[in-house]
Amino acid sequence: NLVQFELLIMKVAKRSGLLSYSA
C-alpha cells in the first residue's frame, strides 16, 4: 500500500532527521 510506504518513509525520515524526504 502506498500509504503504508509513506508512513514508513516518514518514520525513517523522522529518525534520521531528513524531514525533507517526506516533503
UniProtKB/Swiss-Prot annotation:
Covalent S-S links between cysteines: none
Keywords: Calcium, Disulfide bond, Hemostasis impairing toxin, Hydrolase, Lipid degradation, Lipid metabolism, Metal-binding, Platelet aggregation inhibiting toxin, Secreted, Toxin
Catalytic activity: a 1,2-diacyl-sn-glycero-3-phosphocholine + H2O = a 1-acyl-sn-glycero-3-phosphocholine + a fatty acid + H(+)
Subcellular localization: Secreted
Cofactor(s) the record lists: Ca(2+)
EC number, UniProt record: 3.1.1.4
Catalytic EC class: hydrolase
GO cellular component term of the entry, any: extracellular region
Organ and tissue specificity: Expressed by the venom gland.
Molecular function in Gene Ontology: metal ion binding; phospholipase A2 activity; toxin activity
Post-translational modification: Contains 7 disulfide bonds.
GO BP: lipid catabolic process
Chain's role: Snake venom phospholipase A2 (PLA2) that significantly inhibits ADP-induced platelet aggregation in platelet-rich plasma of human, rabbit and guinea pig. PLA2 catalyzes the calcium-dependent hydrolysis of the 2-acyl groups in 3-sn-phosphoglycerides.
Similarity field: Belongs to the phospholipase A2 family. Group II subfamily.
Protein name from the UniProt record: Acidic phospholipase A2 Cvv-E6c
